[in-house]
């Protein structure tokens, strides 16, 4: 049986205001700051910045 890791689920939400988001995991011990990454937004049909938000 797998053990629980130190990774937490997070939501990366588009800053374009389309409401599109990606979910991923990150290790909060090695990366305590909020994640920001440029990914493709299919609703805006261009690459935009995605910022980490709370996963409800």
Curated annotation (Swiss-Prot):
InterPro entries: Ribosomal_bL33 (IPR001705), Ribosomal_bL33_CS (IPR018264), Ribosomal_bL33_sf (IPR038584), Ribosomal_zn-bd (IPR011332)
Statement: the UniProt record of this protein carries the keyword Cytoplasm: no
SUPFAM superfamilies hit by this protein: Zn-binding ribosomal proteins
PROSITE patterns recorded: RIBOSOMAL_L33
One GO process term, biological-process aspect: translation
The keyword Cell membrane is assigned to this record: no
Family (UniProt): Belongs to the bacterial ribosomal protein bL33 family.
Protein name (Swiss-Prot/TrEMBL): Large ribosomal subunit protein bL33
Organism whose genome encodes this protein: Paracidovorax citrulli (strain AAC00-1) (Acidovorax citrulli)
Gene symbol of the encoding locus: rpmG
């Amino acid at each position: 049986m797998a053990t629980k890791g130190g990774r937490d689920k997070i939501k990366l939400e588009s800053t374009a205001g389309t409401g599109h988001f990606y979910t991923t995991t990150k290790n909060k011990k090695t990366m305590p700051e909020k994640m920001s990454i440029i990914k493709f937004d299919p609703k805006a049909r261009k690459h935009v910045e995605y910022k980490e938000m709370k996963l409800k």
